[in-house]
């Protein structure tokens, strides 16, 4: 079965481990770049899906949507600085996700939503805990569409001090391996349901 991973740098961090863990069970692919915010997803989703047939698509957007930016969208801004704003406000995020889900559902693949991992205190350009609001918005979209959730946020929170880098949304190599165990297990469960 062919599996496509869509996500940001967090998914980049766990891809190789997931591929190794599913060796002999699935052919694991990943989009060729950082998925960025949902606005980037909408621009690129058709190219990422291509003409290939996908059995499972495991996808996430969030950490870039809830990032604060100023004039230059490629640079993070202090959330308290004048002129800084969310890259994708919550209502737009929810609307964009619903649109992305429709486009992915059209492929006939089994979809698995992966919720957004924790934003710790001191994380540059982000506000601690903002992932909760974005995950709630995403949950409304996924519930309406009947899409299961890989709750990577709760999984990461269980060992956050051991697996996440200090004041950073990223993870240590062993932290990415820990995330990969959950991702691979959820994908494996859904392969048999296809």
Per-segment meaning from a language model:
Residues 30-37:
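Short beta->alpha junction loops
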Residues 1-16, 37, 64-66:
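Catalytic nucleophile-elbow at a beta strand-turn-alpha helix junction centered on a G-D-S/GDSL motif
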Residues 20-27, 39-193:
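Alpha-helical cap/lid subdomain in secreted, periplasmic
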């Amino acid at each position: 079965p062919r599996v496509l991973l869509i996500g940001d740098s967090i998914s980049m961090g766990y891809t190789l481990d997931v591929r190794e863990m599913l060796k002999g069970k699935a052919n694991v692919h990943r989009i060729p770049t950082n998925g960025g915010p949902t606005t980037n997803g909408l621009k690129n989703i058709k190219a990422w899906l291509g003409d290939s047939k996908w059995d499972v698509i495991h996808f996430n957007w969030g950490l870039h949507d809830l990032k604060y930016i100023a004039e230059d969208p490629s640079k993070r801004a202090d959330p308290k600085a004048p002129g800084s704003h969310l890259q994708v406000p919550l209502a737009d995020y929810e609307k964009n996700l619903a649109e992305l889900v429709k486009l992915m559902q059209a492929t006939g693949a089994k979809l698995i939503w992966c919720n957004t991992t924790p934003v710790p205190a001191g994380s540059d350009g982000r506000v601690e805990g903002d992932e909760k609001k974005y995950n709630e918005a995403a949950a409304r979209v996924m519930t309406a569409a009947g899409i299961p959730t890989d709750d990577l946020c709760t999984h990461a929170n269980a060992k956050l001090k051991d697996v996440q880098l200090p004041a950073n949304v990223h993870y240590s190599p062993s932290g990415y391996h820990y995330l990969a165990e959950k991702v691979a297990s959820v994908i494996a469960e859904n392969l048999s349901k296809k």
